[in-house]
Amino acid sequence: MIYSVYIIYSKSKDMFYRGHTSDITDRLIRHNGGREKATAIGLPWLLLWCTQKSNKSEAYRLEMKLKNLSRERLIEFMLKYEDDIAGPDALLFLKQWSGC
């Protein structure tokens, strides 16, 4: 089964959330529907970055690595793996954040 590792952002809370899931569409609906405790505040959440892993343990390991990065390092990471950025708006947002 394929798992997605993703990073979402809340402008209202100015915070990032990192997670993994087997169904990214459903997970984003749950985040933006206030049905996830960790993200119930801070709506709406914008998908910035998403990649796929071949199994749950790989996805979990990457999620834990991402959770240990500072905000600056997290943005650098997303820009380094630009192919996984979720569209031109997300790319522009990240480049503005990084000062590029």
Where are these regions (language model features)?
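GIY-YIG nuclease catalytic motif and its immediate N-terminal context
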Residues: 1-53, 57-67, 72-74, 78-100
